[in-house]
Amino acid sequence: MAGNGIVEVTDANFDQDVLKSDKPVLVDFWATWCGPCRAIAPIVEELATEYQGKIKIGKMDVDSNSATPMRYKVTGIPTLLVFKGGQVVEQLVGYKPKDAITQALNKHIG
């Protein structure tokens, strides 16, 4: 599923790939059965290309990984969390247009 430099984030690699990242990280919490998740996926892929080198982007399948979504109280999907310095700095729940996600990301780069 992951491509375009998108990291497949799991409960096992979350701390290393997200919390210890030297760049901000956008994590897309999704599931295969979720229609809005499928709708937002192409936007996330575009952002991975556009923000390459500035922001790390990861996707986490909530059906295969339950500990991390529970830890961050992800109850609805899609949920996009932006982490910076190991902390959540933005939370977007539900389908969001690209410009809303871009605005959230731009606050945390540079």
Where are these regions (language model features)?
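Proteins that catalyze or organize thiol-disulfide redox chemistry
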Residues: 1-26, 31-56, 63-110
